């Protein structure tokens, strides 16, 4: 009886320990899903273009990800980092494409190519950051795809706070500025007849 009780005591203690560990593991909460951001629904500040039939946006491999990227310029200006708990709803190029399609595409004939070269939150100091966007735009003819005009755009917008939401706001503002200035550029370069004729529907 005593030997059986001793055996039970050892096994029972082990079983209780396993159950206790399992119970504690069951109480551990799963990590929260990352917060997701887009560029917002800010309306365009200028009328849409009558020259553009379609927009194509491309980006390098390191920007074809929904990660919200940032850089500590004073620590290592070559290192790109990404927030763990915050991300874009889609890669920046896709978000920019959706914005430009809403603002620019209305039924013209020419095609607009946009190359995103940079899209990052930059920290020159611990308590200061900027949304940095660099873009190249090419207006191409409808028939042959020949380049009619090219222009580069660059933005460095101060973030209201030195964290992921602040970077999102600064980058969204930069895209809004780009959309407005791109529309103005298309209108300007499309004024000469040699560009407006092939771009406008007859």
Question: Residue spans of the language-model regions?
Answer:
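Surface-exposed short loop/turn segments
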Residues: 25-40, 98, 102-144
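Sec-exported extracytoplasmic/periplasmic mature domains
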Residues: 101, 105, 183-191
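Mid-chain, structured segments of secreted extracytoplasmic proteins
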Residues: 78-107
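A structural "domain/chain start" motif
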Residues: 24-89, 189-202
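Soluble periplasmic/extracytoplasmic beta-strand elements of cell-envelope proteins
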Residues: 51-58, 69-71, 111-117, 132-138, ...
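Sec-dependent bacterial lipoprotein signal peptides
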Residues: 1-24
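Short secondary-structure boundary motifs at beta->alpha junctions and helix caps
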Residues: 76-87, 144-184, 188
